[in-house]
Amino acid sequence: MRHGDISSSHDTVGVAVVNYKMPRLHTKKEVIENAKNIANMIVGMKQGLPGMDLVIFPEYSTMGIMYDRKEMFETATTIPGPETEIFAEACRKANTWGVFSLTGEQHEEHPHKNPYNTLVLINNKGEIVQKYRKIIPWCPIEGWYPGDTTYVTEGPKGIKISLIICDDGNYPEIWRDCAMKGAELIVRCQGYMYPAKEQQIMMAKTMAWANNVYVAVANATGFDGVYSYFGHSAIIGFDGRTLGECGEEENGIQYAEISLSQIRDFRQNAQSQNHLFKLLHRGYTGIIQSGEGDKGVAECPFDFYRTWVMDAEKARENVEKITRTTIGTAECPIEGIPHEGKEKEASV
């Protein structure tokens, strides 16, 4: 793992993350113009970072947040579509891979159902090689139709890549799912705003450590008239240490080289902190010394996960017992979100 140079090598993947300024757009024409700006940025970045193999832009960077529902449906796109064609041409021209946000992608039953919040991974030939739909939209605010699975794709120089989006990353399950599928780099594109800056910085580092995986975070910056975005796009080593991190500057860029051989050697040979291996070989030292084989215990010890897999409604019932039974809360009502009880009277 290296930071500070502009190069890369046969063993390292050059990764750039962009603190893209959150756009405030309203029409398809404005979206296309912004996509062209992103494309021009890619070509310029490659000139300054000749080792760049992969460039990552934040959630909402292409379309911004359409706070108007009508505008959200009017600007929802298809994949492939005009935006991805612009990005594909830029990736070919710059000879680099890219991760791009489409908010939103038209639902199969468009316009009768809400769009998806989608990322695409485009290779240096301009081909879309992964399309990921956000599994856990940021409720109650986001109205995206939820996706249902994660993916792993072989990326530049053979590194295995998974994509996740913003609020997805608050749930350890999604990181573990990607890592257990073989991901070596988990890309988290986010449009995260204050006040959750410190929590999100910690989450990315912790999940890198817990899953023995590289993490690249691209976050928005600026103020779009509603939210203020904190940036801090970063590249994090599989040991949880930050290789490079932006501040809050608009359109700031960080760059690092992540080693293929180092992560693969670690996963093969590390012992006390090899979290992926140890989870499925629990207590192997004690099992060996007890004469019960040399593999440890593989069975899942966690009641919640067993219940969730075998009886999702029962798992939901259990969580409602310790939280609440309605989607909304009368203490802080949000329009369109059902709740029980009277609204809390405002204090005088």
Curated annotation (Swiss-Prot):
Keywords: Hydrolase
One Pfam match: CN_hydrolase
InterPro entries: Aliph_Amidase/BUP, Aliphatic_amidase, C-N_Hydrolase, C-N_Hydrolase_sf
Catalysed reactions, as listed in the record: a monocarboxylic acid amide + H2O = a monocarboxylate + NH4(+)
pH dependence: Optimum pH is 7.
Activity over temperature: Optimum temperature is 55 degrees Celsius.
SUPFAM superfamilies for the chain: Carbon-nitrogen hydrolase
Active-site residues, as the UniProt record annotates them: 59 (proton acceptor), 134 (proton donor), 166 (nucleophile)
Function: Catalyzes the hydrolysis of short-chain aliphatic amides to their corresponding organic acids with release of ammonia. Efficiently hydrolyzes propionamide, acetamide and acrylamide, but shows a very weak activity with aromatic and longer chain aliphatic amides. Also exhibits in vitro acyl transferase activity, transferring the acyl moiety of short-chain amides to hydroxylamine to form hydroxamates.
Family of the protein in this entry: Belongs to the carbon-nitrogen hydrolase superfamily. Aliphatic amidase family.
Entry protein name: Aliphatic amidase
Organism classification: Bacteria, Bacillati, Bacillota, Bacilli, Bacillales
